[in-house]
Amino acid sequence: LPREWRDQPVGRDRGMAIEESQSLLIEMIVCRSRPFVRYLMPLLQKHFGVSGPEWDPENVYAHLTRVRRSLIRVDADELTYPLHIQLRYDLEKQLLAGALAVRELPEAWAEFMQARFNVRPARQQEGCLQDIHWAVGSFGYFPSYALGAAIAAQLFEKLRGDVPALDEQIARGEFAGLFGWLREKVHGLGAKVSTQELLKLATGKPLTATASLRYLEGKYLEDPASRSAAA
């Protein structure tokens, strides 16, 4: 964030959707990519002495992008994660509208998981007590994760277009191009403009789901890792 705006309202981040987008862009898009795995593997071999076919870069990538049902939101993959957010969003709306009593929440949660994931939590720690958000009063926060993922995909798509050598840079452990673009297009604006205006300035268009769908289809359908490696 701009130093000259520090301690001013305009010097804050734009909001939680943008903040989550920055986390997810690095955590999910960059760090679970083939270029990053190429950068990571020599470090693992040097510092931890890993070897063998299970440490083949494509096999590691397959594990990082494995899709499977999970009871726990923070352990979920990119494809099933939105369903975890939908669950919380739907139940949260029902709670606030008075359509769902707090005592009914555990069973409503379990029914959703059974219907959408074909798994059922055995205890409440795997269900409605796994997150701290409601306990600390953070109602309305969960959609920030879904919005953040969509924003991250849209930003990254434009970033790759603006920095054609980005994949090669990441594979070499050179992140100046990545973070330089983000600082200029996102961080440097602080809270000066709205979220939609920030996206228009950075990508040329307001937020849509198009880039997110294109990213997921490309990664998991058009150019997937060898799933047998991650079995």
Feature roles, as predicted:
Residues P2-E4, R34-F36, G161-A165:
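Surface-exposed helix-capping loop/turn segments at secondary-structure junctions
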Residues E4-Q8, R12, R66-I72, G127-G137:
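Acidic/His metal-coordination segments adjacent to aromatic residues that form catalytic metal sites
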Residues R3-W5, R12-R14, R32-S33, A153, ...:
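Flexible loop/turn segments at secondary-structure boundaries
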Residues I85, Y89-A231:
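C-terminal, non-catalytic "cap/extension" segments appended to globular domains
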Residues P9-L100:
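A conserved active-site cap/scaffold subdomain adjacent to cofactor or substrate pockets
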Residues L1-R6, I26:
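Catalytic Zn2+-binding segment of zinc metalloproteases
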Residues L1-R3, P57-R66, P121-C128:
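Active-site-adjacent bridging/hinge elements
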